[in-house]
From Swiss-Prot:
Pfam families: NanE (PF04131). The lineage of its organism: Bacteria, Bacillati, Bacillota, Bacilli, Bacillales. Pathway: Amino-sugar metabolism; N-acetylneuraminate degradation; D-fructose 6-phosphate from N-acetylneuraminate: step 3/5. The keyword Secreted does not apply. The keyword Isomerase applies. This is Putative N-acetylmannosamine-6-phosphate 2-epimerase. One of its GO terms (cellular component) is cytosol. The gene is nanE.
Amino acid sequence: MGNSVMEKIKGGLVVSCQALEDEPLHSAFIMSKMALAAVQGGAVGIRANTAKDIRAIQSEIDVPIIGIYKKDYDDSDVFITPTLKEVREICETGVEIVAMDATTRKRPHNEDLKDILNAIRKEFPNTLFMADTGSIEDVYYADSLGFDLIGTTLYGYTEETANKNISDDDFSHLKEVLKSTKRPVIAEGKIDSPSKARQVLTLGCYAVVVGGAVTRPQEITTRFTNEIKKI
């Protein structure tokens, strides 16, 4: 399955369809229709949060899905598919790719990422695993653990990389990531325009994930209203 999945997303746009509990569009049904609309617009894949949303989306579309499970724990800042329990739950949906926080930060219950990956590969040998990284150190860490894909998802969202943008200094961080690993790199995080999406692919990324700029109406509307307020 791995090679065929990778071919399907190569050079394309993956759309992240997520709405958290405190957001107006929080609904598995709505996310499934959002995913369908994205695929009709040319998306080659979908990134989705929670088994419930994933199963609803699977009933609507037939493109690869990157599955995650966002869950907060009191003893850790790691929240993207943070423990073996969440990783297993997402794998059980049958998604082609499962993404998880692959930073060097302490995980909930002091679980070890290497142990999680080793255990889950035995249970789901055909599933691909994507590392959501923040820093270059995270990239080296994820690479050493044997992740199938490296994502820049958490760049700008960890304490170490706070307030940074993937396009800063002419995409310098992304360029360093591409030099630091031979694994396919998925550009993700603050890619909020078509031109940015094109640029990251031109630089050599395997695929690009775009979320808020496509699927969060409140964010899109705010960009317009903020600009109008400048009048």
